[in-house]
Amino acid sequence: MAEVDLCALFFNLRVKDVTSSDELKKHILSASDERNPLTEPGENQSMDVDEEGGTRDPGILYLYVDCPTMMQCFYGTSFPYNSRHGALLTNLPPYQKDVSLSEVSRGLRQASGFFGYEDPIRSAYFAALSFPGHVAKLDEQMELTSTNGESLTFDLYASDQLRLEPGAWVRHGECKFGMN
């Protein structure tokens, strides 16, 4: 199976030796900044977001899946349907220091109703997307408990389109939740 081979290769890759939450955050933000000069004024500047009050750009959104699914997305340029709404996206960054991977997996499972998030490894990889397509902001939010017991809330979005637009990928990799 090609996805398994790609996943094995992917697992051995380290993006600029990213080993901590802070390094991953800097890497994603710099990648996002690098993309801005590549677009013409008015082109891909914002995305359509369905919500009361009009359109706004939620910025970078994140998709959490396992490694083989990530490889299928990356090389097949398509989204997995991981919720009843289509592809479930969130503004929870993969470098959030004060949550554990198992808590993120629990939150995704609760938010999506998707049994695939039972095992934390099913959400160990991320795709950071500057989504030029249509996304809908969902009414529900993802509620997580931080490692120090505080309640954290993140917005949820969904896309029902199958294909990823060219240039939607900002970065992808292994999550660094709870790492200093």
Curated annotation (Swiss-Prot):
The keyword Hydrolase applies. This is Cytokinin-beta-glucosidase. Hydrolyzes cytokinin glucosides thus liberating free cytokinins. Residues 31-54 are annotated as: Disordered. Its EC number is 3.2.1.-. It is an enzyme of class 3 (hydrolase). Keywords: Cytokinin biosynthesis, Glycosidase, Hydrolase. The gene is ROLC. It comes from the Eukaryota. The lineage of its organism: Eukaryota, Viridiplantae, Streptophyta, Embryophyta, Tracheophyta. GO terms for biological process: carbohydrate metabolic process; cytokinin biosynthetic process. One of its GO terms (molecular function) is beta-glucosidase activity.
